[in-house]
């Protein structure tokens, strides 16, 4: 049995700490309606949860780069006012973060969500005090891939030994991003 004790824990946000289904899918529906694409069932848009938005709009709707950029702007128009709060905290999240902090582990956020939105969500759920650092994507797309976000968190903190670090997330992007940065990962199955 592995008795390894990690000192630095990176968490994904959407699908790992929170259930953002209504907010994200409603924001995607709003963006798609701009292109006269109507969606009846929000659950059909769940694949948008996790990956970078540009990738999703291009993969799922064959948008060009330009169309995807417009869709992202429309998505953020809705999300920044309403979708950000159409979100629920998974049961036990607050207690888990409290216990990790009490056991002197440092907690970081590494999310594909734009950093200001991620910070707002942590504040909305009163979780911000648990986090040593919050890392997210940028609005200009210069840091949108999960591997880049993880690298940003590692570069922006005092983490010296990568073997002391683990990334916890619910999507392949979290696991692949951790691997690209030579850190361990743990996948959750409930997100």
Model-derived features: where do they sit?
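Active-site neighborhood of HAD-like aspartate-dependent phosphohydrolases
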Residues: 2-47, 58-61
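Conserved Lys-Pro-Asp/Glu-containing loop-to-beta segment of HAD-superfamily phosphomonoesterases
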Residues: 8, 146-175
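Substrate-recognition element of Asp-dependent hydrolases with the DxDx(T/V) motif
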Residues: 28, 96-122
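Helix-loop "lid/cap" segments that line or gate small-molecule binding pockets
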Residues: 31-32, 52-65, 121, 149-156
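Conserved H-loop
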Residues: 38, 128-132, 160
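Metal-dependent phosphoesterase signature
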Residues: 58-95
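A short, structured active-site edge motif that brings together acidic residues
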Residues: 128-143
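Acidic, Mg2+-coordinating phosphoryl-transfer loop and its flanking beta/alpha structural elements
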Residues: 167-191
């Amino acid at each position: 049995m592995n008795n390894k004790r990690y000192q630095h824990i990176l968490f994904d946000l959407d699908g790992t700490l929170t259930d953002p289904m209504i907010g994200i899918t409603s924001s995607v529906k709003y963006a798609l309606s701009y292109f006269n694409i109507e969606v009846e069932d929000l659950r059909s848009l769940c694949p948008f949860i996790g990956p970078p938005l540009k990738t999703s709009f291009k993969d799922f709707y064959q948008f060009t780069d330009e169309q995807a950029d417009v869709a992202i702007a429309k998505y953020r128009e809705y999300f920044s006012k309403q979708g950000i709060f159409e979100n629920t905290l998974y049961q036990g999240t607050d207690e888990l973060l409290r216990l990790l902090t009490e056991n002197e582990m440092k907690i970081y956020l590494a999310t594909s969500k734009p950093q200001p939105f991620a910070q707002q969500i942590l504040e909305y759920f009163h979780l911000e005090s648990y986090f040593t650092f919050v890392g997210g994507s940028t609005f200009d797309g210069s840091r949108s891939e999960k591997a880049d976000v993880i690298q940003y968190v590692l570069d922006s903190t005092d983490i010296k030994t990568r073997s002391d670090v683990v990334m916890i997330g619910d999507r392949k992007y979290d696991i692949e991003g951790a691997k690209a940065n030579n850190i361990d990962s743990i996948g959750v199955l409930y997100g």
